[in-house]
Amino acid sequence: MRWPTVPAPDGKGEMIDQDAVNELVDYAIAHGVNYFDTSPMYVQGWSEKSTGIALKRHPRESFYLATKLSNFHPDTWTREGSIAMYRKSFEDMQVDYIDYYLLHMIGGGGMEQFRKRYIDNGMIDFLVKEREVGRIRRLGWSFHGDIEVYDYALQMHDRGEVHWDFVQIQLNYVDWKHASGSNFKAEYLYDELAKRKIPAVIMEPLLGGRLSNVPDHIVARLKQREPERSVASWAFRYAGSPQDVLTVLSGMTYMEHLQDNIRTYSPLVPLTEEETQYLYDTADLMMEYPTIPCNDCKYCMPCPYGIDIPAILIHYNKCVNEGNVPESSQDENYRKARRAFLVGYDRSVPKLRQADHCTGCNQCSPHCPQTIDIPKELHRIDKFVEQLKQETL
Protein backbone atom coordinates (compact mmCIF):
# COMPACT_ATOMS: atom_id res chain seq x y z
CA MET A 1 0.00 0.00 0.00
CA ARG A 2 2.66 2.52 1.02
CA TRP A 3 5.11 2.11 -1.85
CA PRO A 4 8.08 4.51 -1.83
CA THR A 5 7.69 7.67 -3.88
CA VAL A 6 9.92 10.30 -5.48
CA PRO A 7 9.14 13.83 -6.72
CA ALA A 8 7.45 13.82 -10.13
CA PRO A 9 9.60 15.11 -13.03
CA ASP A 10 7.28 18.08 -13.56
CA GLY A 11 7.61 19.05 -9.91
CA LYS A 12 3.91 18.51 -9.30
CA GLY A 13 3.36 15.94 -6.60
CA GLU A 14 5.04 12.56 -6.34
CA MET A 15 5.30 9.34 -8.30
CA ILE A 16 6.06 5.77 -7.28
CA ASP A 17 9.75 4.87 -7.23
CA GLN A 18 9.45 1.67 -9.27
CA ASP A 19 13.09 0.67 -8.84
CA ALA A 20 12.68 0.84 -5.05
CA VAL A 21 9.42 -1.12 -5.26
CA ASN A 22 11.12 -3.83 -7.33
CA GLU A 23 13.95 -4.05 -4.80
CA LEU A 24 11.52 -4.41 -1.88
CA VAL A 25 9.46 -7.06 -3.66
CA ASP A 26 12.53 -9.04 -4.71
CA TYR A 27 13.93 -9.05 -1.18
CA ALA A 28 10.54 -9.92 0.32
CA ILE A 29 9.97 -12.92 -1.94
CA ALA A 30 13.56 -14.12 -1.47
CA HIS A 31 12.97 -14.15 2.31
CA GLY A 32 9.59 -15.89 2.40
CA VAL A 33 7.04 -13.08 2.04
CA ASN A 34 4.35 -14.23 -0.37
CA TYR A 35 1.20 -12.11 0.24
CA PHE A 36 0.92 -8.72 -1.48
CA ASP A 37 -2.05 -6.44 -0.77
CA THR A 38 -3.08 -3.55 -3.01
CA SER A 39 -6.16 -1.63 -4.19
CA PRO A 40 -7.27 0.59 -7.10
CA MET A 41 -7.23 3.60 -4.76
CA TYR A 42 -3.85 3.19 -3.05
CA VAL A 43 -1.01 5.64 -3.81
CA GLN A 44 -3.35 7.97 -5.71
CA GLY A 45 -4.45 5.11 -7.97
CA TRP A 46 -1.01 3.81 -9.01
CA SER A 47 -0.48 0.97 -6.55
CA GLU A 48 -1.98 -1.89 -8.59
CA LYS A 49 0.05 -1.05 -11.68
CA SER A 50 3.29 -0.69 -9.72
CA THR A 51 2.65 -3.91 -7.80
CA GLY A 52 1.93 -5.73 -11.05
CA ILE A 53 5.17 -4.52 -12.64
CA ALA A 54 7.21 -5.73 -9.66
CA LEU A 55 5.49 -9.11 -9.35
CA LYS A 56 5.45 -9.84 -13.10
CA ARG A 57 9.18 -10.53 -12.76
CA HIS A 58 8.46 -13.53 -10.50
CA PRO A 59 6.70 -16.87 -11.13
CA ARG A 60 2.95 -16.45 -10.60
CA GLU A 61 2.82 -19.42 -8.22
CA SER A 62 5.41 -17.78 -5.94
CA PHE A 63 3.04 -15.18 -4.49
CA TYR A 64 -0.56 -14.47 -3.45
CA LEU A 65 -2.13 -11.24 -4.70
CA ALA A 66 -4.93 -9.38 -2.93
CA THR A 67 -6.87 -6.41 -4.24
CA LYS A 68 -10.27 -4.83 -3.75
CA LEU A 69 -13.50 -3.49 -5.18
CA SER A 70 -12.87 -0.05 -3.76
CA ASN A 71 -15.18 2.74 -2.69
CA PHE A 72 -14.65 5.55 -5.16
CA HIS A 73 -17.29 8.16 -5.94
CA PRO A 74 -20.86 6.74 -5.97
CA ASP A 75 -20.82 7.18 -9.76
CA THR A 76 -18.69 4.00 -9.86
CA TRP A 77 -21.16 2.00 -7.76
CA THR A 78 -23.24 0.86 -10.71
CA ARG A 79 -22.86 -2.74 -11.82
CA GLU A 80 -21.18 -1.57 -15.03
CA GLY A 81 -18.79 0.76 -13.20
CA SER A 82 -17.93 -1.90 -10.63
CA ILE A 83 -17.25 -4.57 -13.23
CA ALA A 84 -15.06 -2.12 -15.13
CA MET A 85 -13.05 -1.48 -11.95
CA TYR A 86 -12.75 -5.22 -11.34
CA ARG A 87 -11.51 -5.92 -14.86
CA LYS A 88 -9.06 -3.03 -14.81
CA SER A 89 -7.39 -4.59 -11.77
CA PHE A 90 -6.51 -7.64 -13.86
CA GLU A 91 -5.17 -5.40 -16.61
CA ASP A 92 -3.10 -3.18 -14.30
CA MET A 93 -1.65 -6.08 -12.32
CA GLN A 94 -1.03 -8.21 -15.45
CA VAL A 95 -2.61 -11.37 -14.02
CA ASP A 96 -5.37 -13.75 -15.10
CA TYR A 97 -6.54 -14.63 -11.58
CA ILE A 98 -6.59 -12.90 -8.18
CA ASP A 99 -5.89 -14.94 -5.07
CA TYR A 100 -7.75 -12.78 -2.53
CA TYR A 101 -10.46 -10.34 -3.62
CA LEU A 102 -12.13 -8.02 -1.12
CA LEU A 103 -15.16 -5.80 -0.84
CA HIS A 104 -13.32 -2.71 0.36
CA MET A 105 -14.13 -0.94 3.64
CA ILE A 106 -17.60 -2.30 4.27
CA GLY A 107 -19.26 -0.46 7.13
CA GLY A 108 -17.71 2.87 6.24
CA GLY A 109 -21.02 4.34 5.13
CA GLY A 110 -23.39 2.23 7.17
CA MET A 111 -25.91 -0.36 6.04
CA GLU A 112 -27.44 1.76 3.29
CA GLN A 113 -24.09 2.23 1.55
CA PHE A 114 -23.20 -1.45 1.94
CA ARG A 115 -26.42 -2.44 0.22
CA LYS A 116 -26.05 0.08 -2.60
CA ARG A 117 -22.37 -0.62 -3.17
CA TYR A 118 -22.32 -4.41 -3.06
CA ILE A 119 -25.78 -6.02 -2.86
CA ASP A 120 -28.37 -4.02 -4.83
CA ASN A 121 -26.11 -3.76 -7.89
CA GLY A 122 -25.56 -7.52 -7.91
CA MET A 123 -21.81 -7.32 -7.36
CA ILE A 124 -21.64 -9.96 -4.63
CA ASP A 125 -23.46 -12.40 -6.92
CA PHE A 126 -21.12 -11.45 -9.79
CA LEU A 127 -18.01 -12.01 -7.66
CA VAL A 128 -19.29 -15.36 -6.39
CA LYS A 129 -19.62 -16.49 -10.02
CA GLU A 130 -16.11 -15.18 -10.75
CA ARG A 131 -14.88 -17.32 -7.87
CA GLU A 132 -16.69 -20.36 -9.29
CA VAL A 133 -14.81 -20.07 -12.60
CA GLY A 134 -11.48 -19.46 -10.89
CA ARG A 135 -10.74 -15.83 -11.71
CA ILE A 136 -11.06 -15.17 -7.98
CA ARG A 137 -9.62 -17.83 -5.72
CA ARG A 138 -10.91 -16.47 -2.38
CA LEU A 139 -13.58 -13.84 -1.66
CA GLY A 140 -13.80 -11.69 1.46
CA TRP A 141 -14.01 -8.11 2.71
CA SER A 142 -12.26 -5.51 4.82
CA PHE A 143 -14.08 -3.74 7.63
CA HIS A 144 -14.10 -0.18 8.97
CA GLY A 145 -17.02 1.50 10.67
CA ASP A 146 -20.57 0.43 11.48
CA ILE A 147 -20.65 -2.82 13.47
CA GLU A 148 -24.18 -3.49 12.19
CA VAL A 149 -22.71 -4.03 8.72
CA TYR A 150 -20.02 -6.35 10.10
CA ASP A 151 -22.62 -8.48 11.85
CA TYR A 152 -24.91 -8.49 8.81
CA ALA A 153 -22.14 -9.66 6.47
CA LEU A 154 -21.38 -12.54 8.84
CA GLN A 155 -25.08 -13.38 9.04
CA MET A 156 -25.09 -13.67 5.24
CA HIS A 157 -22.36 -16.28 5.69
CA ASP A 158 -24.35 -18.05 8.42
CA ARG A 159 -27.48 -18.18 6.24
CA GLY A 160 -25.53 -19.67 3.35
CA GLU A 161 -26.15 -16.66 1.10
CA VAL A 162 -22.44 -16.28 0.45
CA HIS A 163 -19.38 -18.08 1.77
CA TRP A 164 -16.65 -15.71 2.94
CA ASP A 165 -13.20 -17.25 2.62
CA PHE A 166 -11.52 -14.62 4.81
CA VAL A 167 -12.12 -11.23 6.44
CA GLN A 168 -9.68 -8.36 6.94
CA ILE A 169 -9.88 -6.56 10.29
CA GLN A 170 -7.89 -3.99 12.22
CA LEU A 171 -6.17 -5.70 15.15
CA ASN A 172 -3.42 -4.51 17.47
CA TYR A 173 -2.79 -4.46 21.19
CA VAL A 174 -4.40 -1.03 21.60
CA ASP A 175 -7.55 -1.71 19.58
CA TRP A 176 -8.15 -5.00 21.40
CA LYS A 177 -9.68 -3.05 24.27
CA HIS A 178 -9.28 0.65 23.45
CA ALA A 179 -10.63 1.08 19.90
CA SER A 180 -11.42 4.71 19.04
CA GLY A 181 -13.21 6.56 16.27
CA SER A 182 -15.02 4.14 13.96
CA ASN A 183 -12.92 1.17 15.04
CA PHE A 184 -14.79 -1.47 17.01
CA LYS A 185 -12.96 -3.47 19.66
CA ALA A 186 -10.70 -5.95 17.88
CA GLU A 187 -11.49 -8.60 20.48
CA TYR A 188 -15.10 -8.75 19.26
CA LEU A 189 -14.16 -8.65 15.58
CA TYR A 190 -11.67 -11.49 15.91
CA ASP A 191 -13.86 -13.66 18.15
CA GLU A 192 -16.77 -13.48 15.70
CA LEU A 193 -14.51 -14.76 12.93
CA ALA A 194 -12.85 -17.42 15.06
CA LYS A 195 -16.14 -19.00 16.12
CA ARG A 196 -17.00 -19.39 12.41
CA LYS A 197 -13.49 -20.58 11.48
CA ILE A 198 -13.15 -17.70 9.01
CA PRO A 199 -9.45 -16.80 8.65
CA ALA A 200 -8.53 -13.25 9.64
CA VAL A 201 -6.20 -11.03 7.64
CA ILE A 202 -4.81 -8.38 9.98
CA MET A 203 -4.42 -4.73 8.97
CA GLU A 204 -3.06 -1.86 11.05
CA PRO A 205 -0.91 -4.00 13.38
CA LEU A 206 1.03 -0.79 14.13
CA LEU A 207 -2.10 1.39 14.34
CA GLY A 208 -0.94 3.52 11.44
CA GLY A 209 2.65 3.58 12.68
CA ARG A 210 1.74 4.85 16.13
CA LEU A 211 2.88 1.62 17.81
CA SER A 212 6.35 2.08 16.38
CA ASN A 213 6.51 5.77 17.35
CA VAL A 214 5.46 5.59 20.97
CA PRO A 215 6.35 7.99 23.81
CA ASP A 216 9.82 7.64 25.31
CA HIS A 217 8.58 6.04 28.52
CA ILE A 218 6.78 3.35 26.49
CA VAL A 219 9.95 2.71 24.48
CA ALA A 220 11.85 2.28 27.76
CA ARG A 221 9.18 -0.08 29.09
CA LEU A 222 9.37 -2.37 26.04
CA LYS A 223 13.16 -2.21 25.74
CA GLN A 224 13.43 -3.21 29.39
CA ARG A 225 11.87 -6.56 28.47
CA GLU A 226 13.56 -7.16 25.10
CA PRO A 227 16.52 -4.77 24.57
CA GLU A 228 17.42 -6.28 21.18
CA ARG A 229 13.92 -6.19 19.71
CA SER A 230 12.41 -3.17 17.97
CA VAL A 231 9.35 -1.52 19.47
CA ALA A 232 7.42 -2.45 16.31
CA SER A 233 8.25 -6.14 16.69
CA TRP A 234 6.10 -6.35 19.82
CA ALA A 235 3.06 -5.21 17.82
CA PHE A 236 3.78 -7.62 14.97
CA ARG A 237 4.22 -10.57 17.33
CA TYR A 238 0.91 -9.64 18.95
CA ALA A 239 -0.91 -9.43 15.61
CA GLY A 240 0.45 -12.76 14.42
CA SER A 241 -0.16 -14.74 17.60
CA PRO A 242 -3.92 -15.53 17.44
CA GLN A 243 -4.57 -19.01 16.07
CA ASP A 244 -6.96 -18.03 13.26
CA VAL A 245 -4.81 -15.26 11.76
CA LEU A 246 -4.04 -16.00 8.11
CA THR A 247 -1.50 -13.23 7.58
CA VAL A 248 -0.50 -9.80 8.89
CA LEU A 249 -0.25 -6.78 6.58
CA SER A 250 2.45 -4.14 6.87
CA GLY A 251 2.93 -1.01 4.76
CA MET A 252 6.70 -1.34 4.38
CA THR A 253 8.10 1.68 2.55
CA TYR A 254 11.71 1.19 3.59
CA MET A 255 14.05 -1.79 3.42
CA GLU A 256 14.85 -1.58 7.13
CA HIS A 257 11.13 -2.00 7.94
CA LEU A 258 10.96 -5.07 5.73
CA GLN A 259 14.09 -6.58 7.24
CA ASP A 260 12.86 -5.99 10.80
CA ASN A 261 9.53 -7.67 10.03
CA ILE A 262 11.27 -10.64 8.43
CA ARG A 263 13.35 -11.05 11.59
CA THR A 264 10.17 -10.97 13.70
CA TYR A 265 8.47 -13.66 11.61
CA SER A 266 11.48 -15.93 10.94
CA PRO A 267 10.05 -17.75 12.76
CA LEU A 268 7.22 -16.05 14.65
CA VAL A 269 7.42 -16.69 18.38
CA PRO A 270 3.82 -16.28 19.66
CA LEU A 271 3.37 -14.14 22.74
CA THR A 272 2.92 -15.84 26.09
CA GLU A 273 -0.09 -14.95 28.23
CA GLU A 274 2.19 -12.90 30.47
CA GLU A 275 3.65 -10.97 27.51
CA THR A 276 0.17 -10.34 26.14
CA GLN A 277 -0.96 -8.87 29.46
CA TYR A 278 2.19 -6.75 29.54
CA LEU A 279 1.14 -5.23 26.21
CA TYR A 280 -2.41 -4.61 27.45
CA ASP A 281 -0.94 -2.78 30.45
CA THR A 282 1.24 -0.83 28.01
CA ALA A 283 -1.86 0.10 26.00
CA ASP A 284 -3.51 1.40 29.18
CA LEU A 285 -0.52 3.71 29.71
CA MET A 286 -0.67 4.91 26.11
CA MET A 287 -4.30 5.93 26.49
CA GLU A 288 -3.13 8.77 28.72
CA TYR A 289 -1.79 10.46 25.57
CA PRO A 290 -4.70 11.88 23.47
CA THR A 291 -3.49 11.37 19.91
CA ILE A 292 -5.64 11.66 16.77
CA PRO A 293 -6.33 8.21 15.21
CA CYS A 294 -4.75 9.05 11.82
CA ASN A 295 -2.96 6.10 10.19
CA ASP A 296 -1.51 8.07 7.24
CA CYS A 297 -3.55 6.11 4.68
CA LYS A 298 -3.99 9.34 2.66
CA TYR A 299 -7.55 8.45 1.63
CA CYS A 300 -8.40 12.07 2.53
CA MET A 301 -6.02 13.36 -0.13
CA PRO A 302 -5.76 15.36 -2.26
CA CYS A 303 -7.29 18.36 -0.51
CA PRO A 304 -8.78 20.83 -3.04
CA TYR A 305 -7.08 23.65 -1.12
CA GLY A 306 -3.68 22.00 -1.02
CA ILE A 307 -3.61 21.16 2.69
CA ASP A 308 -1.34 18.25 3.65
CA ILE A 309 -3.82 16.69 6.07
CA PRO A 310 -1.85 13.57 7.09
CA ALA A 311 1.38 15.53 7.66
CA ILE A 312 -0.41 17.95 10.01
CA LEU A 313 -2.07 15.20 12.05
CA ILE A 314 1.11 13.12 12.20
CA HIS A 315 3.15 16.11 13.39
CA TYR A 316 0.58 16.77 16.11
CA ASN A 317 0.65 13.12 17.24
CA LYS A 318 4.44 13.11 17.24
CA CYS A 319 4.50 16.14 19.51
CA VAL A 320 1.92 14.59 21.83
CA ASN A 321 4.04 11.45 22.14
CA GLU A 322 7.17 13.49 22.80
CA GLY A 323 5.51 15.69 25.42
CA ASN A 324 5.67 18.80 23.23
CA VAL A 325 2.01 19.84 23.37
CA PRO A 326 1.89 22.18 26.39
CA GLU A 327 -1.45 22.75 28.04
CA SER A 328 -0.46 26.07 29.59
CA SER A 329 2.31 28.67 29.48
CA GLN A 330 2.82 27.77 33.13
CA ASP A 331 4.03 24.27 32.22
CA GLU A 332 7.59 23.61 33.34
CA ASN A 333 8.85 22.81 29.84
CA TYR A 334 6.60 25.32 28.02
CA ARG A 335 9.41 27.18 26.19
CA LYS A 336 11.05 24.01 24.95
CA ALA A 337 7.75 22.40 23.93
CA ARG A 338 6.51 25.58 22.21
CA ARG A 339 9.65 25.85 20.10
CA ALA A 340 9.67 22.12 19.28
CA PHE A 341 6.04 22.22 18.10
CA LEU A 342 6.30 25.39 15.99
CA VAL A 343 9.70 24.70 14.44
CA GLY A 344 8.76 21.09 13.72
CA TYR A 345 5.44 22.20 12.19
CA ASP A 346 7.12 24.53 9.70
CA ARG A 347 9.67 21.85 8.83
CA SER A 348 7.08 19.10 8.41
CA VAL A 349 4.38 21.06 6.58
CA PRO A 350 4.99 23.90 4.06
CA LYS A 351 3.19 27.07 5.12
CA LEU A 352 0.80 27.00 2.16
CA ARG A 353 -0.26 23.47 3.15
CA GLN A 354 -0.88 24.11 6.86
CA ALA A 355 -4.15 23.91 8.77
CA ASP A 356 -4.98 27.62 8.56
CA HIS A 357 -5.97 27.10 4.91
CA CYS A 358 -8.84 24.74 5.77
CA THR A 359 -12.18 26.13 4.58
CA GLY A 360 -14.26 23.44 6.24
CA CYS A 361 -15.54 22.08 2.91
CA ASN A 362 -15.41 18.58 4.45
CA GLN A 363 -14.57 16.83 1.20
CA CYS A 364 -12.03 14.79 3.18
CA SER A 365 -13.94 13.33 6.14
CA PRO A 366 -16.21 10.88 4.26
CA HIS A 367 -13.10 9.11 2.93
CA CYS A 368 -11.46 8.61 6.35
CA PRO A 369 -11.58 4.96 7.52
CA GLN A 370 -11.10 6.16 11.10
CA THR A 371 -14.07 8.59 10.79
CA ILE A 372 -11.96 11.51 12.00
CA ASP A 373 -13.78 14.85 11.86
CA ILE A 374 -10.89 16.28 9.86
CA PRO A 375 -12.00 19.95 9.59
CA LYS A 376 -12.66 20.01 13.34
CA GLU A 377 -9.18 18.63 14.10
CA LEU A 378 -7.49 20.98 11.63
CA HIS A 379 -9.25 24.00 13.13
CA ARG A 380 -8.33 22.84 16.63
CA ILE A 381 -4.67 22.45 15.65
CA ASP A 382 -4.67 25.81 13.85
CA LYS A 383 -6.11 27.48 16.95
CA PHE A 384 -3.43 25.81 19.08
CA VAL A 385 -0.69 26.99 16.70
CA GLU A 386 -1.97 30.57 16.90
CA GLN A 387 -2.06 30.38 20.69
CA LEU A 388 1.55 29.22 20.70
CA LYS A 389 2.58 32.00 18.32
CA GLN A 390 0.74 34.67 20.29
CA GLU A 391 1.68 33.06 23.62
CA THR A 392 -1.91 33.17 24.84
CA LEU A 393 -2.15 29.64 26.27
Predicted regions and their residues:
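N-terminal binding-site loop/beta-alpha segment at the start of enzyme catalytic domains
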Residues: 1-63, 126-132
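Short Fe-S-cluster ligation motifs
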Residues: 322-361, 387-393
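Short, acidic/polar
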Residues: 13-28, 77-94, 145-157, 231-236
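Active-site groove signature of glycoside hydrolases
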Residues: 90-114
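Acidic (Asp/Glu)-rich catalytic clusters
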Residues: 29-30, 52-62, 87-96, 129-131, ...
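Active-site mouth loops of central-metabolism enzymes
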Residues: 1-19, 68-81, 112-115, 145, ...
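A short, structured active-site edge motif that brings together acidic residues
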Residues: 61-74, 103, 169-171
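Beta/alpha (TIM)-barrel catalytic core signal, keyed to glycine-rich beta->alpha loops juxtaposed to Asp/Glu
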Residues: 44, 106-314, 321-341, 366, ...
